[in-house]
Design a protein with these regions (language model features):
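Ferredoxin-type iron-sulfur electron-transfer modules and their immediate structural context
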Residues: 1-156, 204, 237, 241, ...
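Residue-level detector of alpha-helix initiation sites
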Residues: 98, 163-164, 188
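N-terminal glycine-rich dinucleotide-binding loop that anchors FAD/FMN and/or NAD(P) in oxidoreductases
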Residues: 126, 196-223
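N-terminal Rossmann-like FAD-binding beta1-loop-alpha1 element of flavoenzymes
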Residues: 155-181
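Glycine-rich FAD pyrophosphate-binding loop
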Residues: 178-194
Length: 247
C-alpha cells in the first residue's frame, strides 16, 4: 500500500509522460581506467527532483512496486524526492529493505522496477535505482537511519553466512530484540558485496557503513570460521543459541 495515495495527487500525467529522462553522469573513461572507484556520479538534488517528477504515479499497486522483489513503495519515494523531502524518501525504502543503499546500486533494475515502468511503452523509465541511491546518500549525510528496536528478548540467534541473505535476516532479528552473531568463512562480513562485486559497481565503504549501523544495534561477527569444517552446527547450538539461520 502506498504511503502517498496516487489517486490523491493532482498532477498532469500526460505531460509527465512526455518529459525527457535524465542521462546518468558517468566519470570520464580516462579516469576510470586508472582506478576501481564507482562509475556512476549520481544525481544532484535538482536533477533528482526533476527525474522523480517524471513518475506518473500509477494506481496502487503500481507496476514498479510489483516488479520489485521487496515491493518498495517506489511511487511514494518518488513523490517525496520530487518535493525535496529526501530523508523521508529514504525512510520509505527502509520499511521494506534491509540494504536499500546496496539494492539501489546492484539490483538489475532494468529487469525489475524500471523494466516494469509504464513509461517504457513510449520512452525511457524513471531511473528509480539511482534515485534510491540518492535518497539514501542524502539521509546518511544528514542523519543516519536508526530503526526502532524492540526490548531484548534474551534469545540468541546464530547466522551462518554474513552475505546479503544472512545480513537481511540478522537485521530483522536485531530489530526484534534478539542477540545476533554472524559466522563466516571470510575474515570480514559482506559475502558477495565485499568479495564478489567490484568496487566500480559498489564501493566497499557503502557496505561497511551499513555494517557499522548493525554493529551499533549489537551485531557480532566471528570470521575465518567455516561452519561444517572448523565448527559444526551442533557445536554452535551447544553454545547457547536458540536458533540458527543458514544463509
Amino acid at each position: 500500500m502506498q504511503a502517498v495515495p496516487s489517486e490523491n495527487l493532482a498532477i498532469d500525467r500526460k505531460k509527465r509522460a512526455k518529459e525527457p529522462f535524465l542521462e546518468l553522469d558517468l566519470r570520464p573513461a580516462e579516469e576510470r581506467v586508472c582506478d576501481f572507484h564507482e562509475v556512476v556520479i549520481g544525481f544532484t538534488p535538482e536533477q533528482a527532483k526533476i527525474e522523480a517528477a517524471r513518475c506518473i504515479h500509477c494506481p496502487d499497486p503500481a507496476p514498479c512496486m510489483l516488479g520489485c522483489p521487496t515491493h518498495n513503495d517506489i511511487p511514494s519515494a518518488m513523490w517525496l524526492i520530487e518535493q525535496g523531502k529526501f530523508s523521508e524518501a529514504a525512510k520509505i525504502y527502509h520499511k521494506t529493505s534491509s540494504l536499500p543503499e546496496v539494492c539501489g546500486r546492484v539490483c538489475p533494475h532494468e529487469q525489475l522496477c524500471e523494466g516494469a515502468c509504464v513509461l517504457n511503452k513510449n520512452g525511457e523509465p524513471v531511473i528509480t535505482g539511482q534515485l534510491e541511491v540518492f535518497a539514501l546518500e542524502q539521509e546518511r549525510a544528514k542523519e543516519p537511519y536508526v530503526p526502532k528496536i524492540a526490548p531484548s528478548t534474551g534469545k540468541k540467534v546464530a547466522i551462518v553466512g554474513a552475505g546479503p541473505a544472512g545480513l537481511g535476516c540478522g537485521d530483522e532479528l536485531l530489530k526484534l530484540g534478539h542477540e545476533v552473531t554472524f559466522y563466516d568463512s571470510k575474515p570480514a562480513p559482506g559475502g558477495l558485496l565485499v568479495y564478489g562485486i567490484p568496487n566500480f559497481k559498489i564501493s566497499k565503504d557503502v557496505f561497511f557503513e551499513r555494517w557499522n549501523d548493525m554493529v551499533k544495534l549489537g551485531a557480532k561477527f566471528v570470521g575465518n570460521t567455516y561452519i561444517g569444517r572448523d565448527k559444526s552446527i551442533d557445536d554452535i547450538l551447544t553454545e547457547g543459541f536458540d536458533a540458527m539461520f543458514v544463509g
